[in-house]
């Protein structure tokens, strides 16, 4: 039977519930337990797919094609369980499902209410998402006291009663601020946060005390006394220089022992040697490179969370400190390519819309003409094709129909038909809704022997995740290939271009898929590892 650890946050947002939850999950997995994780988001959007990156950050795409919260990326980087559409749901998704059932008459004319209908649907999805895991960690987004979170908190209160205390526990993250002028930490915010939880029938079993200073033993004793939590379950979690230290920090304080004993689980001790190696490689690099990352959402770097982590993983794999130079593509439009000078490689990530695209195209041209290693992802591949068409082919009006529907040379256009991961045919047109209408999820890709990308993966066929609705225009592709554009990756049916390279360039690879979604700190990712190696070669050459 599955045991549940419900994770809530108090006092302020952005305390790191996702990282703390994933770190505990990693320790439990290291003890031989089967672990999964869920994220419950209180916002009313059906999913984050149409939300602004400036508001929500990255949209993480699962293997089965769900557009989900970026915390699922943390989950997959810390544990080896692959997330699915069942591991993340929102208030909007819950209400959509309940209202659809009401319209069908499934409730037999009953008055639909938050309790029991909404809370029952939340509980049903938690149980379904947990599956057959030994332990499921369920993170509730937002902060205790938010009106949006109330149905979720009520649902977990009910579920705790239904499954019993031997199968459910509550872990609460809270802020313990350090007052520099007084030279001490303050426990009052934590006391009030727990008081808020207890007022709705939820008693925490574990408190994770976030602070920029260690929470000393006397403060932990005081917190335990006022919150009715065992002193050994009051955990100090201060800021660290790498998040991959956190499993070790929690393990050193006995959190996993407490959980295992509380649930009555029989399992081995935790082997965290893999995490020790990750931390050692991260903190003791032997090399250093600078990579210019040219994007359009630089005001909120969470928009590129998985990509930034993937570059860190590539650094770990190569024992290299990767310095990312964040450059807004609009700044290149206004200030020119001087912003790129001195970079050992250039990375252009995905994005949507016209703003900043010309700056990205200029960055591609700089990389191609100056033989600087280049990696383009999603839109980064599309702008690479546009740049090639304009500056090698001489098609000065070349563009994507996303940006110019009247382009005389639309080298990138809307995908109107493709097969999804199950083999079912998907069709789209310009009038399709924005939400949930992209080519999403894992797709097989055939790689050309002898190509740079094949050298990285060492395979003929790979599987990577996608999130796009535009592709290279096959009608103009033969002319691009004749001029020297190398198509080194195609969809399984050969219909869609997945990877392009530049002939006569030391390392120029652009892919339509998002390899960052499958990169992990323990295993890295072959494409990013190859990119960092190319950057090292470029630096050594200089």
Curated annotation (Swiss-Prot):
Residues holding Mg(2+): 71, 139
InterPro entries: Class_I_gatase-like, CTP_synthase, CTP_synthase_N, GATASE, GATase1_CTP_Synthase, P-loop_NTPase
Binding residue positions for UTP: 13, 186-191, 222
Active site: 378 (nucleophile), 514, 516
Reaction it catalyzes: UTP + L-glutamine + ATP + H2O = CTP + L-glutamate + ADP + phosphate + 2 H(+); L-glutamine + H2O = L-glutamate + NH4(+); UTP + NH4(+) + ATP = CTP + ADP + phosphate + 2 H(+)
Pathway the protein takes part in: Pyrimidine metabolism; CTP biosynthesis via de novo pathway; CTP from UDP: step 2/2
Example GO molecular function: metal ion binding
Pfam families: CTP_synth_N, GATase
EC number: 6.3.4.2
Any GO BP: pyrimidine nucleobase biosynthetic process
Keywords, ordered alphabetically: ATP-binding, Glutamine amidotransferase, Ligase, Magnesium, Metal-binding, Nucleotide-binding, Pyrimidine biosynthesis
Presence of the UniProt keyword RNA-binding in the record: no
Summary of the function given for this chain in its UniProt record: Catalyzes the ATP-dependent amination of UTP to CTP with either L-glutamine or ammonia as the source of nitrogen. Regulates intracellular CTP levels through interactions with the four ribonucleotide triphosphates.
Family, similarity comment: Belongs to the CTP synthase family.
Further remarks about this protein from its record: CTPSs have evolved a hybrid strategy for distinguishing between UTP and CTP. The overlapping regions of the product feedback inhibitory and substrate sites recognize a common feature in both compounds, the triphosphate moiety. To differentiate isosteric substrate and product pyrimidine rings, an additional pocket far from the expected kinase/ligase catalytic site, specifically recognizes the cytosine and ribose portions of the product inhibitor.
Family matches, as PANTHER family: CTP SYNTHASE (PTHR11550), CTP SYNTHASE-RELATED (PTHR11550:SF0)
Stated name of the protein: CTP synthase
Organism of origin: Pseudomonas putida (strain GB-1)
Gene name tied to this protein: pyrG
